[in-house]
Amino acid sequence: MVVRTGTCSFCEYRIYPGRGQRFIAKDGRGFFFLTKKAKCLSLRKVKAQKITWTIARRRLWKKVKATDIAQKKKKRNVTVARAIVGISLEEINRRKNLDASHKKAEAEKAVRELKQKKANDIEKKRADRKLQGKDVKAAKKAETKKTKQPVGAKGGKK
């Protein structure tokens, strides 16, 4: 039969069923003390390491094996590849596994495409400007023809 035991909050001894005293502080923290002596020392805020009979003191002076203290396992971050908006997971993996020469060739290809696109945009703008310029010139000519001034004598006042 296994007996459920607790540990004293001050001296760290085992507390068997029917023993000890539970203390709840004003801030809601719960303590479990083995004896009245442990409770009084804890409430007076005496450090357990300064009291010779506590396990904290024995641990400080290396009288207790360090293997008794459980060590926490380190959390290791696991990297997971996920798709990004616009690029699928397969595309990301393909780009990761490319050789340096392939990467360089792809980069050059992308640069060439960008330059070509810019050149096309510039030519388009120039063509639009030429068309606009012709329209403006034609409109000006039409205005000048419509509003011809009457020919009269040149000169000053009479």
From Swiss-Prot:
Gene Ontology CC entries for this record: cytosolic large ribosomal subunit
Cited Gene3D superfamilies: 6.10.250.1270, Ribosomal protein L24e
InterPro entries assigned: L24e/L24_sf (IPR038630), Ribosomal_eL24 (IPR056366), Ribosomal_eL24-rel_N (IPR000988)
GO BP terms, alphabetized: cytoplasmic translation
MF terms in GO: mRNA binding; structural constituent of ribosome
Keywords: Ribonucleoprotein, Ribosomal protein
Record family assignment: Belongs to the eukaryotic ribosomal protein eL24 family.
PANTHER family: 60S RIBOSOMAL PROTEIN L24 (PTHR10792), RIBOSOMAL PROTEIN L24 (PTHR10792:SF1)
Protein name from the UniProt record: Large ribosomal subunit protein eL24
Primary gene name: RPL24
